[in-house]
Amino acid sequence: MAFMVKSMVGGQLKNLTGSLGGGEDKGDGDKSAAEAQGMSREEYEEYQKQLVEEKMERDAQFTQRKAERATLRSHFRDKYRLPKNETDESQIQLAGGDVELPRELAKMIEEDTEEEEDKASVLGQLASLPGLDLSSLKDKAQTTLGDLKQSAEKCHIM
């Protein structure tokens, strides 16, 4: 309870005393900020430049990660024949257009494609066997299934 009263009244008191208390001009904002940090003006300017450079690097890395994710999404859209997304394409273009997937994601996609190729190749091999007639196999399977149904109908237990 005391905290709530202090936070409500304290903020108003600070505003009131701040407007009444100081008739002094702050002058140059960088100079006062540099002095408050305990640095000279040159050190403060160098510090500000470093902050800006670090922010630009973080933004570039973030944009790169967003483009990698967009590349992955567009890959799956192509794979499953889904409609394209304009925001993904714009994110890829913002990152420079030529975005590579991270190794882990590329490895996962490669494993998926290998599995699909194996499945396709096994089916392809079955169809390409010279002594195998798929239509006769289908007929035999249907007759066997029909025989099983008839024997199940004749069973007295069921």
From Swiss-Prot:
Instruction: Please give, as recorded in its UniProt entry, the membrane topology of this protein.
Output: Lipid-anchor
In this chain, where does the modification Cysteine methyl ester occur? 155
Q: Which GO terms describe its molecular function?
A: neurotransmitter transmembrane transporter activity; SNARE binding; syntaxin binding
Q: Which regions are flagged for Basic and acidic residues bias?
A: 23-33
Complexes and interactors: Binds to the SNARE core complex containing SNAP25, VAMP2 and STX1A.
Q: Which PANTHER family match?
A: COMPLEXIN (PTHR16705), COMPLEXIN-3 (PTHR16705:SF5)
Indicate what this protein is called per its UniProt record: Complexin-3
* Origin species: Mus musculus
Supply the source organism's classification. Eukaryota, Metazoa, Chordata, Craniata, Vertebrata
Gene name, Swiss-Prot/TrEMBL: Cplx3
